[in-house]
């Protein structure tokens, strides 16, 4: 089935992180994004959409959590307890693009913000897990907050002085 309105963007993402084994802090050293949204009608708007999608992916992977107790009661008090990255926490994005025209759109355009958001989350997560791969770690639950990463370091015994 090939409906006339089917369009989808795609991208590829690469993330390099440093993990402080004593504090659990994760610093994104480098993040590279290559996106394809078809015809680039307004490059400045596209860049903003990519930055926004990546920033939300960063927030989801690295800190956003809505905690509940065993009875399902929400434990957060306000958005002060919810990670909303500012320009201070947000990494510098290195972006590039390729163009594959969409045959179902008169201009060949596609969506843009979906790819960096959906692809960015596992990219951040895999970068953190990769930092522990030499110790046999193949999975870590998100978000990768400093507390969770510190607990992982502690469980592995790598943060002993």
Feature roles, as predicted:
Residues 1-161:
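C-terminal catalytic domains of large/alpha subunits in multi-subunit enzymes
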């Amino acid at each position: 089935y090939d409906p006339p309105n089917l369009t989808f963007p795609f991208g590829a993402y690469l993330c390099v992180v440093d993990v402080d084994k004593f504090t659990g802090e994760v610093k994104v050293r480098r993040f590279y994004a290559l996106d394809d949204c078809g015809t680039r009608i307004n490059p400045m708007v596209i860049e903003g959409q990519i930055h926004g999608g990546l920033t939300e992916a960063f927030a989801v992977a690295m800190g956003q959590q809505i905690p509940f107790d065993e009875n399902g009661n929400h434990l957060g008090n306000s958005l002060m307890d919810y990670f909303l990255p500012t320009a201070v926490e947000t990494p510098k994005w290195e972006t590039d693009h390729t163009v594959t025209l969409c045959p179902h759109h008169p201009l060949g355009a596609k969506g843009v913000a979906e790819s960096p958001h959906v692809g960015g989350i596992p990219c951040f997560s895999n970068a953190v897990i990769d930092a522990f791969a030499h110790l046999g770690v193949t999975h870590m639950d998100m978000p990768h907050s400093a507390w969770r990463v510190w607990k992982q370091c502690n469980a592995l015994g790598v943060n002993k002085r």
